[in-house]
């Protein structure tokens, strides 16, 4: 499912116009992104949690030259599914 399909599904399920549903979907994405950017987390009971995980700096190798490369530390988004979502997916 891509974003347009998600917007259509939300519009149909919630009885909204597609433009209202698109605004709602965009707002949710914006809030999640802003919260994670501020290193916060979002916990949705029964669905899952969006958190920020820190990856430490490490050394890597360029596969074509074999030269050692420094890989900088960075923060990455992480999603952990909740029990309700796991149960829904598994049947």
Swiss-Prot record:
InterPro entries: Hist_DNA-bd, Histone-like_DNA-bd_CS, IHF-like_DNA-bd_dom_sf. Signal peptide: none annotated. The keyword Glycosyltransferase does not apply. The keyword DNA-binding applies. Keywords: DNA condensation, DNA-binding. Residues 57-91 are annotated as: Disordered. One of its GO terms (molecular function) is DNA binding. PROSITE patterns: HISTONE_LIKE. Pfam families: Bac_DNA_binding. GO terms for biological process: chromosome condensation. Belongs to the bacterial histone-like protein family. PANTHER family: DNA-BINDING PROTEIN HU, DNA-BINDING PROTEIN HU-BETA. Histone-like DNA-binding protein which is capable of wrapping DNA to stabilize it, and thus to prevent its denaturation under extreme environmental conditions. Binds to nod promoters and induces DNA binding. This is DNA-binding protein HRL53.
